[in-house]
Each structure stands twice: as structure tokens, then as C-alpha cells.
């Protein structure tokens, strides 16, 4: 049963792991504060990528159909499930080993690694509070499943105005 007000969960609270998993059960997602991601870096990434999306450099990084990295323009955007109407967005798929404008790579890579470490923490919380019969079905710890993954990506979204 869902509730009407999404709780904000501080990662500094003693029961943040339990509150996070409870929020996933009740709402399907969670709102976390006091997380380890550097919001100054996040805002800098938004600013830097806005310049990229406004430039013709996007054409030098058209997405690669085989690797799925690079720039996806408005014409390439996906549609919501069951809808024929494409989303009004453009985006860039970043993989650490993939293509990226050289002047944007270092900041994005630093953020990618921080987000990956954060994801491992959240996955460990989910595992810690999963029922035993569910955990028994895991082939490995949830937090290990993203180790050295070649398929984890960072998507930089832009909604044109």
C-alpha cells in the first residue's frame, strides 16, 4: 500500500538502511539526503554538458549502434512502454571505456566512480534487508554484481527548451 508523502531519508541516521529499503517497498523509490555524491560536481557536470548539447560537437559523438555509447539526439530518443510517441529528450551514454568529449571526461569519470561506490552501498542495504529465501537465490552479493561491469553506464540527459 502506498502512502501520500515520500519520506526524506538522511544517510547519517542510524536506521537509514532500513528506511531506504522500506521506502523502496512502499513507494518504489527513495529520497536520500546527506549522501556521498558531490553536488557541486553534479551542477558543474550539468553546466558543462549544457554547452555540449548546445554545440555541433554532438555530431562528432553520434551513438554507436554496437556499443550504445555516445550522443542520442531527439530523433533517436526512446518511447515510453506502450507509446508510439518518442520522448522529447536528447542524451549521452557514457561508459568509462567508451567515447566522450575529452574536456568532459575527467569530471564525468570521477562522478561515475563515486556513483558506482554509492550504488554498491545501496545494493548492500537491499541485500541486508532481503528475506533469506530471496538471498539464497543470489549468485553473488548484490553489491558485487556491478564490480568490473562493462554494462554500467551513466546517462547524461538533456530536455531541450
Where are these regions (language model features)?
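Peripheral, non-catalytic segments flanking oxidoreductase cores
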Residues: 1-161
